[in-house]
């Protein structure tokens, strides 16, 4: 079968960003790469783009007329879905470059997020110097701040856009080069600073047989790992640090979504999990901690991160929440209970050591997980960062992944 020539897809709302889009197209063509320009404007006006807004909007489930309603908010949401579906139907997508303000960024990035990890994605945006998590999510989108507004060409915007063109062209070429693959299957592992010793022991034990992909449990970290599991790219998961659940349930800043553990249930991938850092909720700097939490047990992890110790009642709630999701998993599941503590701070003499709070967490898991031959809780009578715990996790993983 003849190989399909890959192209860079350049997306912009041509009614407001057409001048910048055409400038980028010329730069990319001069660089020798094939470009497909796509108009994602919601105004319905004509444009010189190779793919018209009408063609993109036709991919919306309710049709183009449901996109061009004249109501900006709903039109952006509809066109975003239409562009995602349009892009998913193209077999020659070698990279995607987007430009936009707040609306354009919200419109283009969902389609980028839906593409596989490794396909270059660059968004030049006025929003790129703020909180970009809603745009990037668990994907590998690169965000470039536009400095000036994307509202015409000037000496600053020309330079920034030229850099963006060079960056995406370079990534496009690099993505077509083979990457050395030693044949080891990949496993996903979750880690936090306070579970680092555990994960270091685990990766050292697995390294010879597996390509260990370690994900920082920052909310998007867990989502990234589960995205790979959903894509069939992981041979197994060692979800040793499930702390994102604390933030989701109790208002922290590093929260997972309600779909945490969903990819494990959908994929059936061999899964070893544990309670890593379920003793803490993450906030920003100390002065950002919500007023209702100011009298709680707080620990300044660093100037930008403040940790709040979970209570026995909160632990019982999150134990039940995790159990309910583990019960949906029909693949091989082993969830380890580190009876000596769940983080570096949850150890004798440390700030968060609380045997009663931990006991509430463990008991909730025992009370609510429906154990079967394939779904088991495993009691480990040591601290999570003890080498013996790591050994137990590795042994359980080997047992279920044969």
From Swiss-Prot:
It comes from the Bacteria. It holds the Pfam family UPF0261. PANTHER family: UPF0261 DOMAIN PROTEIN (AFU_ORTHOLOGUE AFUA_1G10120). Belongs to the UPF0261 family. This is UPF0261 protein BPP1817.
